Amino acid sequence: MIKWPWKTNDAGRNMALPWDEALAIPVLANLQPDEQSKLVQLADRFLQQKRLVPLQGFELDPLKNARIALLFCLPVLELGIEWLDGFHEVLIYPAPFVVDDEWQDDFGLVHNQRVVQSGQSWQQGPIILNWLDIQDSFDASGFNLIIHEVAHKLDTRNGDRASGVPLIPLREVAGWEHDLHAAMDNIQDEIDLVGESAASIDAYAATDPAECFAVLSEYFFSAPELFAPRFPALWQRFCQFYQQDPLLRLRQNEDPAGNSSHQLH
């Protein structure tokens, strides 16, 4: 059990939550004890600042609250909780939900259709999630709905809309865009060769730069062994932006014989 040094001084109202149990999921398994402690502090502040709203009969409990907060704060572990400013509510459906989607075709005609969504993120509005996909985000598989939507929020801090380029120094923007588009082209080439379902990276990453940043952020934190060797230049840019190196964590967690619960490819 982790010793939480601030428990005795009543630093947060959520310290009674089952943090040790909440941390016991594969996507968080490689965090060092000091990182776990820092993440819990951020998650406590997150739950004080944000309102989790269950919808359509879904029920929250202390463990669900804790795990949701931990995943929200993982991308900002080194950036700081203020990077999650700009929204106050997280709406949670029990399963993927149906929304009305409006879009304009090449001829200027506006179409409206009902589509199934896993999650949504609005620049000045709430983040919308569903519990089934949140549960699937606990694994170290490359899929993480919460990190995906958080990445969109981080992306929009750089302007009015998500562009795939987060708030980085201006001198680094051109290089970031070059490496991101190169990754998109590489992913699309694989899709053209083997099809979407057989692609080793989620095909959604090839749709536009904003989705590429969000999808690769999922892989950055939950499957670094797939991201880093395939796109090494972009990997380094993600490490610099997030100020974290999940692949280093993964390797440090290997046993003395060089084995790991996650096999590097």
UniProtKB/Swiss-Prot annotation:
Pfam (any one): Peptidase_M90
Record's subcellular location: Cytoplasm
Top-level taxon of the source organism: Bacteria
Keyword field contains Cytoplasm: yes
Gene3D superfamilies, sorted: Collagenase (Catalytic Domain), Glucose-regulated metallo-peptidase M90, N-terminal domain
Alphabetic keyword roster: Aminopeptidase, Cytoplasm, Hydrolase, Metal-binding, Metalloprotease, Protease, Zinc
Cofactor (UniProt): Zn(2+)
GO terms assigned for molecular function: aminopeptidase activity; metallopeptidase activity; zinc ion binding
GO BP terms: proteolysis
Main location: cytoplasm
Record text on cofactor binding: Binds 1 zinc ion per subunit.
EC number: 3.4.11.-
InterPro entries: MetalloPept_cat_dom_sf, MtfA_enterob, MtfA_fam, MtfA_N
Sites where the protein binds Zn(2+): H111, H148, H152, E211
One GO CC term on file: cytosol
Function, as annotated: Involved in the modulation of the activity of the glucose-phosphotransferase system (glucose-PTS). Interacts with the transcriptional repressor Mlc, preventing its interaction with DNA and leading to the modulation of expression of genes regulated by Mlc, including ptsG, which encodes the PTS system glucose-specific EIICB component.
Family statement: Belongs to the MtfA family.
Record's subunit section: Interacts with Mlc.
Name the record gives this protein: Mlc titration factor A
Provenance organism: Escherichia fergusonii
Upper classification of the organism: Bacteria, Pseudomonadati, Pseudomonadota, Gammaproteobacteria, Enterobacterales
